[in-house]
């Protein structure tokens, strides 16, 4: 991310909107001769934990502050129930990594249920699946523990279980329970754990590291939340860049994302202060990212820390001999990912349940090193990391974190890519339609982050059409632009640090906001060719823009109408007789989808061709995809 956005509304958008629309026409003829090859991994995802996109978002664990991690965790999200009090206890750590537990002090003479609740990440989404709950208990106890999922305002019970359990005051005991649930109508649900007050009056119990999971995406242990994962899977993306982004860098070298603290049992993961204002549990760790890639068929793009923190934080940039420990750390990480089970770190991975090495072909060195004082040292740092990685893993593709020549070696290593980020206004994205037409083809581009940023809390129709125009320009040049990702990807509506985002959600299990930009990304990603074809036209680009591709015997023509007038479109593709037309449109350029309204969704229609000619209307402010066969 380039900078923190605080923009929140659409009121300042300088739109001109006419109730009277003119009708114009564009005729296109698609060549069936073989054209330029198109990147097979052009569309994909950039992910970092921002807007609670990880914890509280796609990561399936539902309880907030569940491990009381960090130096001063407090009791955020927790509340006592009955004749009892709760406190953060540093005298009874669960593990070295989880140095606090939740102490339940029960009053002498207590009666009824005593315990505590957790409100989750502004609610607990109960989707009707069987939930898995684990926690640890320490203290002299023998009896029943009741766990419920209960409406915060209504008291309605959406799931419960009773656990017969004993524990002692010497060691923590792990407890596992399954909770059958019924779907809640909203996210206003609490997790509640209670015991009988009369049986523990005048004593205390300690609890540690609570986990609550619904049935996860692909039933993966410690996996993803289906509510958020499925819309991503529906996009049929090709790659995932992780773990960031700013959230890779940290505020200092000590607060960087440390791969080795995100692996293994979660009780051995300390978490870290993230770079977007909240603590990260790191339950979604290195292996979980690779499982995510595996389960969605995504090519992993692993970002590695490169001696530079945000705004030159801590002692960074780190150069010279001081870089060696960090280079070694990256090599250890790569051995963990790629080494067989006979290697030191490959055997560690195998001990955590993954015997086979992960599939990894691309590594990005750093993040946005052209910013915050990183440029001057990046030539040295990039070269040091690149040389070491290439020597150990010569088949890996290395990606530089910037395309700015002043920050890069005069000659990039053979096969290296550059990463370019572009947050811009709608009009400027359209002006950049031809940005890559004359780029040097010897240096492949990864557009690692882009989107329309224009005082908009939500993606809106004009901005999404502008993104489509930009994407058409990218696809026309997908021999040199190899990958491109909208950013940011995900947003929990209740806790947002950046707007707009591609997909938003609340803790209502039925509420996922698929934005206008989401639909554009989906339309372009699921309709992909491997060859770009020449198109002849009776008019120049603007306000209608287009690109044509094919795969096997199917042709795809993608169009964007960046204007307030209707366009009559004729597309001729020799030998094609039919197809499907998908259109996303709204005559109001300000139209947007949000948590309170869904105004814009794609429409589909079957198409018939006469002598290879398709005729259809492209409305004002619209994006269309013709899939012809």
From Swiss-Prot:
Pfam families xrefs: Alpha-L-AF_C (PF06964), ASD1_dom (PF22848)
Keywords of the record: Carbohydrate metabolism, Glycoprotein, Glycosidase, Hydrolase, Polysaccharide degradation, Secreted, Signal
Glycan attachment residues as annotated in the record: 36, 51, 140, 152, 168, 171, 260, 494, 534
Catalytic function, reaction form: Hydrolysis of terminal non-reducing alpha-L-arabinofuranoside residues in alpha-L-arabinosides
Coiled coil: none
Subcellular location field: Secreted
Gene Ontology cellular-component annotations: extracellular region
InterPro entries: Alpha-L-AF_C (IPR010720), ASD1_cat (IPR055235), Glyco_hydro_b (IPR013780), Glycoside_hydrolase_SF (IPR017853), Glycosyl_Hydrolase_51 (IPR051563)
Pathway participation: Glycan metabolism; L-arabinan degradation
One MF term in the entry's GO annotations: alpha-L-arabinofuranosidase activity
Enzyme kind, highest EC tier: hydrolase
Record's keyword annotation contains Signal: yes
SMART domains: Alpha-L-AF_C (SM00813)
Organism superkingdom: Eukaryota
Keyword Flavoprotein listed: no
Enzyme nomenclature, EC number: 3.2.1.55
SUPFAM superfamilies: (Trans)glycosidases, Glycosyl hydrolase domain
GO biological process terms held by the UniProt record: arabinan catabolic process; arabinose metabolic process; L-arabinose metabolic process
Signal sequence bounds: 1-25
Protein function: Alpha-L-arabinofuranosidase involved in the degradation of arabinoxylan, a major component of plant hemicellulose. Acts only on small linear 1,5-alpha-linked L-arabinofuranosyl oligosaccharides.
Family of this protein: Belongs to the glycosyl hydrolase 51 family.
Name of this protein: Probable alpha-L-arabinofuranosidase A
Gene behind this protein: abfA
